[in-house]
Amino acid sequence: MLEARAARGGTLVLGGGFAGSYVARLLGQRGATIVSLENFMLFTPLLPEAASGTLEPRHVVVPLRLMCPHAELLLGKLTALDPTSRTATVETETGTFEVRYEQSVLALGSISRRLPIPGLAEHGLGFKDLADA
């Protein structure tokens, strides 16, 4: 049986990256519930500096709880979304929750695409997360 809960402020934000954290921050005191695998927002434009050693890796992340103080953070993974019943199923370390919402924001991020350029796969470097830096 799933534990049911309501999204804070009626808004469920799926993803804690640039878009998701910005929406939650804009909602201000109204609040929101953020579902994210990480408890931080990664500032990807600074990853090359972290990789080169000119910037410490801790300076390219912002804790979501600090950036969005009025938001509830669910560290977990979205496993189902039903727009008809306005519910989302979220799997966390402590259990699986069914979250009811009035509005949802899908801000799940992107994936890197490697272009078909000769030699890129063998010699190119990509920066998508902190581990890459």
What are these regions (language model features)?
Residues 2-74:
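Beta1-alpha1 glycine-rich phosphate/pyrophosphate-binding loop at the start
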